[in-house]
Amino acid sequence: MKKIRAYATAAHFGPTMIVTTIAFTIALVLGSTAEALGIAFTVFLGQLIIGWSNDIYDYQDDLKHQRGKKPLVAGTITISELKRLTFIFIPIAIAANLLGPLGLKGGGVYLLGVGCGIAYNFYFKFSVLSPLPYAIACAALPASVFYGVARTPPLWILITGSLLGVAFHFLNVLKDLSQDRESNIGGLPQRLGKWFSILLSFLLVCVSLFFLFGQ
């Protein structure tokens, strides 16, 4: 049980469940409960890959900053164990998304979002373009659900998803901003600083609410 909790924590369980719940809610509104549960499960698998790849890549940096809440740093699981489980789950997640309830089109779009999450972990977090994978992935999520139930996603939901995704990106890095700079992680929030990031997040949320409730 302790290992399972450690793997869940390494997958960034809170954000993973938020994304999964959003997918389930959209699917439930558009289709049946069975479809929604199936879609939520496939989305959950993709989020596991993103979270685990993040902790694998950040392992040395987490050690440097003594982030003892991270399972790899705490020693609850080893990096070889996490890598092994990640590589086992990658083909499972790909197959479940392409052959499951999302279908080829919806599954392909969602996997694009998963790819963006992994690309952020390994590359974009160091770039001024760090918001880009968030913008794409958070538009891909609702789009994939719409395609999964044979519906065309409206433009407003794609824009709303992108804006909220970028806002989350700016807020999510605030807690580690100074440590990120020490580690030469130069994403856009790190370059703009704390208060500009908070202000930009607020503006993005306001604009996204306009698109959401203006329909």
What does each of the following model-derived ranges do?
Residues 1-215:
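Multi-pass alpha-helical membrane architecture of UbiA-family
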